[in-house]
Amino acid sequence: MFRGATSLNMDAKGRLAVPAKHRDALHAQSEGNLVLTAHPHRCLLLYPLPAWEPIQSKIMALSSFDRQSSALQRLLVGFAEDVELDGAGRLLVSPVLREFAGFEKQVMLVGQGSHFELWSMEAWRAQLQQVMSAESVELPDELEGFSL
């Protein structure tokens, strides 16, 4: 289970060092074989390969004749790249995905349970500000009776 938010520095080659606490779990789940892809919110998704494969199968089972489905297929599967953690626990983000997400030097790694989101620092702060300034957040019906 991946949780927590960590600020990472991207090097000049586009590599990010994954924190040790997550690195060990990623190696245990997938031997360091990961999938990195684009998300409609202009962040990236990082999945252990075994967790990504059933998601990709579901996405590709959608009708390619439906505009929304085919757009989602192009985004999530079309941008998907196999990446590996190197010996130093780093992953390489391709120039295409760096450009898509607007990555510069600082990147936020945000645990989402089964996977991570990677955000440019600017986009991370903007979406946090948007969430925090919302006067009323509408909850999905499934969460109406939920309390923290």
Curated annotation (Swiss-Prot):
HAMAP family: MraZ. This is Transcriptional regulator MraZ. The keyword Transcription regulation applies. GO terms for cellular component: cytoplasm; nucleoid. It comes from Methylobacillus flagellatus (strain ATCC 51484 / DSM 6875 / VKM B-1610 / KT). Gene3D superfamilies: Transcriptional regulator MraZ domain. It comes from the Bacteria. GO terms for molecular function: DNA-binding transcription factor activity; transcription cis-regulatory region binding. It is found in: Cytoplasm, Nucleoid. The lineage of its organism: Bacteria, Pseudomonadati, Pseudomonadota, Betaproteobacteria, Nitrosomonadales.
